[in-house]
Amino acid sequence: MKEPMKDRAKELALDQLVKVLDRVPLVSSVKNDLGELRSLLYLRRPPRVVALGLGSSGRSTLLRSLIERRPVRHPLDTDHGDWVQIEHEGAKVDWLEIDVDDPAARSQWTHALDEKVPDLVFLTFEPRNVQDAKPIAERAKSLLADLPDGAGALRVFTLLTHSDLIGRGPVEVEAERRVLEAALEECGLDADPPRAVSAISGHGLAALSEAMVLALPEETRLEAARALTRAQEARLRIGNEIVQACTSVSVTVGVTPIPFSDMVVLGPLQALMVSALAYLSGRGLDKKTVAEWLGSLGVVGGLGMGLRFSAQTIAKLVPGAGNVIAAGVAGAGTTAMGQSAIRYFLKN
């Protein structure tokens, strides 16, 4: 219960920031940047993933390997046929497993769609299922045809699981993958080319994680990148998007001729930026973390940020070019703070 309350408080803080900006001249161009931040940060929700396949095709093991921070003694609770809200050490995923050979598969799928529409699909095959891939894919294709009007086509990731059990090396794995690909093409399933993955060795999971984040809707990307521990490129990309959006707002605020508007707007905005980057990394922004981050800046970095704030406030008191100087200082200060947070939270 505490986390939704914190999220609501942050959303209200962003709303207050928008109201402040509404009273400041020359900020209409900033609404797009704030809209992007709202979609990414406060309209965020967990990704919804449906895993179709046979009961022994390694779906739960795959999920655990995708989101796991450290080994756990007990398996994740992934009941078949119903949506399950997985929460594991900060990772959040709405997960649905359906066995396509189960007589109840159709009714389970229909009931699940009444609850929520998935964002993407896993269709899993273990090596011993490859020879029977066509009927499995045809059952999955039949289920996917039941998506409600307006839902759009779902991105389907076909996965050859337990790839570490195939032959003696990558040549045999690729040969098996091609057999699976041919079977899927024959049945006409609209899906990505099969990916060979292993929950044990981790083979293929980094590329799968990155592809998942790219395929997901905007409002799920932050939670997805946070959950998928191997999606390091996605985390950096989203982190830089957050910094760029906040920098754009900072520059616009810096252009305004009102002294000390930086204190009203830039402080909350930069706090929002750093807390978002910490959240993206999977870490909380408590006092200890803040102290460690500030310590990582060093004396020069900390003084530099303080001097930037003083300079941009003083510059606004200078007629004419002072606002331009303040805008440059505000943007540079926000960028520097954001990049230092990226280095600490996302690159360490």
Map each language-model feature to its residues.
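C-terminal-of-GTPase-core extension/linker across diverse P-loop GTPases
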Residues: 22-30, 40, 48-51, 201-251
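Conserved G1/Walker A P-loop phosphate-binding module
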Residues: 2-96, 275, 284, 339
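Residue-level signature of catalytic and energy-coupling elements of molecular machines
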Residues: 62, 122, 258, 274, ...
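Hydrophobic alpha-helical transmembrane segments of membrane transport and translocation systems
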Residues: 335-348
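Switch II of P-loop NTPase G domains
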Residues: 92-148
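Canonical P-loop GTPase G-domain recognition
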Residues: 152-157, 162-225
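Membrane-inserting effector segments that mediate pore formation, membrane fusion
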Residues: 242-280, 284-334
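Flexible loop/N-cap segments at domain edges
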Residues: 231, 298, 302, 341
